[in-house]
């Protein structure tokens, strides 16, 4: 042991094993991921991929009347896997930690889309334009809960339309964030609403959906 850290680790290990009393029984290997302690390939597979799948039901997202790139972005967003400042900092990448939309709070996926005063203003405009089909989100909700709660208990056609509006709204909030980050340009919430309407209009003309009420 050549360093103070190694000595500290040795002392910690000693404390852990010093109080262990052996009972004379033969040691045996126990697999803690099954009830009987026996290893199975099925349990190993489930453990390996347990965190690889989204915990929400993505069917509402993939069936939305939106383009594939918008749906894929939203799939990452709902799992909070987009590269916001909090994620960049966790990777030790240099960045401005503050939200560039409001400039008053740290940036995260949930903040940009739900909590930011700028985003809340955009949602208010979208709510008015959609005749309350889409409502301003609860700032205390998680993205996953917001997405799931927003699309429950409604007819399939209406749900696919509403999901599209949600997707195009968060997509344009993210684009506004990127304009400010990489181009130094800022747009008012009304302009973001106009961009949302334009993208939905392009999709409607190309595919016949979604039809906003």
State where each predicted segment sits:
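A helix-boundary/hinge signal
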Residues: 1-213
């Amino acid at each position: 042991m050549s360093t103070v850290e190694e000595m500290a680790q040795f002392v910690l290990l000693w404390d852990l094993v010093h109080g262990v009393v052996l009972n004379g029984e033969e040691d045996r290997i126990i697999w803690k991921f099954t009830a009987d302690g026996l290893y199975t390939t099925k349990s190993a597979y489930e453990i390996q991929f347990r965190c690889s799948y989204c915990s929400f039901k993505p069917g509402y997202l993939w069936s939305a009347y939106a383009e594939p790139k918008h749906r894929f972005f939203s799939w990452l967003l709902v799992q909070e896997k987009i590269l916001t400042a909090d994620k960049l900092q966790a990777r030790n990448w240099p960045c401005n930690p503050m939200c560039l939309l409001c400039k008053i709070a740290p940036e995260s996926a949930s903040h940009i889309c739900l909590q930011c005063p700028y985003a809340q203003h955009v949602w208010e405009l979208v709510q008015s334009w959609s005749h309350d089909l889409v409502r301003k989100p609860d700032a205390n909700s998680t993205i996953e809960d917001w997405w799931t709660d927003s699309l429950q208990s409604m007819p399939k056609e209406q749900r696919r339309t509403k999901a599209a509006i949600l997707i195009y709204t968060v997509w344009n909030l993210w684009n506004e964030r990127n304009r400010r980050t990489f181009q130094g340009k800022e747009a008012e919430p009304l302009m973001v609403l106009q961009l949302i309407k334009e993208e939905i209009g392009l999709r409607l003309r190309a595919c016949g959906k979604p039809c906003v009420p």
